Amino acid sequence: MPTHSDLPNGDAAVFQDNSFHGEDTYITRELNRRIAIDAVFDGATGRGGGDASGYAAKTLQEATVDSTAGVTALLEMAHQRLFQRGRGRFFLTTATVTLKIGSMLHVVNIGDSPVFLIRGHDIMPLTGTAQGATFLGIA
């Protein structure tokens, strides 16, 4: 059953239905009055995807970040640890992260999950979608 969560940083919501695979993880976190981070991780492969999405989310949940460079560095660290743990296989996840700093919203997107900006009745794609075969972490 989908769950709904109002985010602390404005008019936003997350809808999540993990009844099929349970490999998705999301976080919503207000670091201070100016900075908030929201992220969705979609675990892939059906084998270690849930572990990967959970680990990536925990990494961001426990850290203090104030820039997209900080988000990118944390995700790179999580990637290296998961890659070593799985020897290049199985522990895979996408990451879609928004970092609100003041009135600016920054997006970091890794993988094939599309990102859309919705304002009123306008829907604008911020990223494309993957087309064709995608080869994930096979060493």
Task: Describe every region a protein language model picked out.
Residues 1-139:
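PP2C/PPM-type serine/threonine phosphatase catalytic domain
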